[in-house]
């Protein structure tokens, strides 16, 4: 199993490298066929593992980047090789500290950061982006524009569907979006030392639950949870003798027309009850503070289409060159970073998209 995963890892440049044309896809096609890239991750895992619990444990990784293990290409099984070779890292201070350090780096480089200014429009002229217009109607001109907004939102709303390339029109029209996320953040006034930093809590169903989430867009009574306890590694996430957690639950995106104002409070109770009955005794009594995010929050705060948690799903037809390109096909000075472009979602994927941009921009400098 791990040998085959490592073989997929040898095609890592296809997944993370610079994609200026479709050539890498075609160059690697014989290898992809040989590695049975047409199989799903679950099919690949099932070739080697027979017990249903093991199949679940070794096939859930696509969910961490927004994909259904039953239709995500088995190329993504390379995640096993990546984690086995380099391990799993956690930044002291969490993702917020990564953002803080990037902000400090930008300031050291003389980059001016403007906050609380929503971009309403990208102004274009022929084959160039002239600048942006904010919510106050102010125009700002730029030589190059890098957008980390969702590419579909960038194209359909900020630029306008009639002013984008044919490739982006097809990506937008045919897009299969990732699932939504329900995230419950909570602190406890006691420590749960038995809980590891990362825990995956599996519900009674697997394939049928994923079908409810990805295909039927219905909110089921059962669920699975990724439980994150950063205090296991960084005690500064909570006061002394306290703990900090978030419980992340895959749910349907907003194509499901779920009334989250009604469902969210009930969903919170269900999550707490499930954890309390299995691994966190008296949890309801120990929670001292909590809040949650639903797909509605992702839509309103991050402008992600349908409130999806990871932009578009990592299907084969939405991977590498088939995603929105890092360099726009029509506008010579417009570039994309983030979960919706190449290589994809997750902190490693997003940071790799920035590395791709770092290599691309010099190719198009005046």
Give the positions of each predicted feature.
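C-terminal segments that line or cap access tunnels to active or ligand-binding sites in enzymes
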Residues: 189-299
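Single conserved hydrophobic/aromatic residue that forms the stacking wall/gate
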Residues: 1-21
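Active-site-proximal substrate-binding core of FAD-dependent oxidoreductases
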Residues: 124, 363-366
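A conserved FAD-binding loop/helix module that cradles the flavin
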Residues: 339-361
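Rossmann-like flavin
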Residues: 19-71
